[in-house]
Amino acid sequence: MPIDPKLNVVPFISVDHMMKLVLKVGIDTFLTELAAEIEKDFRRWPIFDKKPRVGSHSQDGVIELMPTSDGSLYGFKYVNGHPKNTHQGRQTVTAFGVLSDVGNGYPLLLSEMTILTALRTAATSALAAKYLARPNSKTMAIIGNGAQSEFQARAFRAILGIQKLRLFDIDTSATRKCARNLTGPGFDIVECGSVAEAVEGADVITTVTADKQFATILSDNHVGPGVHINAVGGDCPGKTEISMEVLLRSDIFVEYPPQTWIEGDIQQLPRTHPVTELWQVMTGEKTGRVGDRQITMFDSVGFAIEDFSALRYVRAKITDFEMFTELDLLADPDEPRDLYGMLLRCEKKLEPTAVG
């Protein structure tokens, strides 16, 4: 089914459509293809209009807008982060996004992005690990077994070949949930009783916790030589997971430094501390992993270009699978300068028909 060319119509991907699209494509294929699109955009990083996301912070959480443009397309995401939401039966993170034509300003796509954000976050993490983890990595510890954990596991298996998972969460029901959800894909799963137990023998350590506080999830004694740390949980000022000692021992890689200095684990460090931008590793301008004993860390906070890539990717997919609704979103008067006349014509249609 082609997308309707009518000017009032914007294709809309609902939650139901997104889930069905992911399943029709296949979760592993979706993650692998999405990672490839993210890498394409990272490799043309300099052409993008970039800025730290605009956030409204409160004691309960944060609401943010994440915009970017490559000069032809413009995309933004609305996203929140409210760690206490789960106690009220709500998601910690919800999101939606828009992709628009820069030439005329018209939206080309409106999409749910709660599920899509989980997928793009996991795809980006695994993509970073492809460059930063040891090539023979097979075991990953996941500290924090909430909504993002299964997506991380699937992405690391699809892209890096991770086979064994060591899971820990202070909420044991979350660990049981994660292990149960991942039994089908064929992982070797160990449910652990502590961070120290979870990191034993891990090639990759993923931290993906939700509490909005300065926390030390990963301490110096948890990290041995050669480990790659995938630090995902940091996403706002005042929220950290990694100890200062671990930060100082690691070679740190980030998406967009002006944003990561505000929201990532590196907010604990002086701004003079060296960090490397991930796109520069992909293009060969900077080095990533240089030895088997090197400790690498991806301080991931999420950046708008990843959402831009995700919106581009799903827009290309929806016509193949007919996974969208035509949304009457834009006013389209017969004469572009006669918007008021459009209102009057609607009023006329609503008038009761005279009976002669």
Swiss-Prot record:
GO biological process: L-proline biosynthetic process
EC number per UniProt: 4.3.1.12
Active site: D235 (proton donor/acceptor)
UniProt note: pH dependence: Optimum pH is 8.0-8.5.
InterPro entries associated with the record: NAD(P)-bd_dom_sf, ODC_Mu_crystall, ODC_N
Temperature-dependent activity: Optimum temperature is 30-35 degrees Celsius.
Induction entry: Is induced by octopine. Is part of the occ operon.
Binding site for NAD(+): T92, R120, A147, Q148, D169, T209, V232, G233, G234, D235, K239, S300
Broad class of enzyme this protein falls into: lyase
Regulation: Is inhibited by L-proline and L-lysine. Is not activated by small concentrations of L-arginine, and is even inhibited by about 50% at 0.5 mM L-arginine.
GO MF annotation list: ornithine cyclodeaminase activity
Pfam families: OCD_Mu_crystall
Reaction equation(s) it catalyzes: L-ornithine = L-proline + NH4(+)
Keywords noted in UniProt: Amino-acid biosynthesis, Lyase, NAD, Plasmid
Binding residues for L-ornithine: R53, K77, R120, D235, V301
Cofactor: NAD(+)
Primary role: Catalyzes the conversion of L-ornithine into L-proline with release of ammonia. Is involved in the utilization of octopine, a catabolic pathway that proceeds through L-arginine and L-ornithine to L-proline. Octopine is a predominant opine in plant cells transformed with Ti plasmid pTiAch5.
Classification via PANTHER family: KETIMINE REDUCTASE MU-CRYSTALLIN (PTHR13812:SF19)
Family recorded in the similarity comment: Belongs to the ornithine cyclodeaminase/mu-crystallin family.
Protein name: Ornithine cyclodeaminase
